[in-house]
Design a protein with these regions (language model features):
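N-terminal Rossmann-like NAD(P) cofactor-binding subdomain of oxidoreductases
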Residues: 1-98
Length: 98
């Protein structure tokens, strides 16, 4: 298996992910489990404990227009949500040009 897509309720992917899975397949998580880099903010926002905080720093925000090279090398990809994608792609050219 090369790639695993997860589309689960908040908290479920984080409770299932482990080094064994990541050593065998790239994981693309469609939930928000690995989008927010601050565990305390994640837990406050979703009202649940994050079950895999050790993988948060490794997860790459999967917006290919901005993080293409990082995504290619990543084992764990946090698929961006629709509102952040729209907002980010709208302002990114302005930020990039300063």
């Amino acid at each position: 298996m090369d790639v695993i897509f997860t589309a689960t309720p908040q908290g479920l992917c984080a409770s299932l992910i482990n080094e064994g899975i990541l050593s065998k397949a790239k994981v693309i998580d469609l939930s928000a489990d690995f989008r927010i880099k601050d565990v305390k903010k994640y837990e406050k926002w979703y009202g649940i404990e994050h079950k895999a905080p050790q993988f948060i720093d490794e997860a790459v925000y999967g917006l290919c227009e901005i993080n293409r090279e990082e995504i290619k090398k990543a084992r764990l990809i946090a698929n961006p949500g629709c509102y952040p994608t729209c907002s980010t792609l709208s302002i990114y050219p302005l930020i990039k040009e300063g």
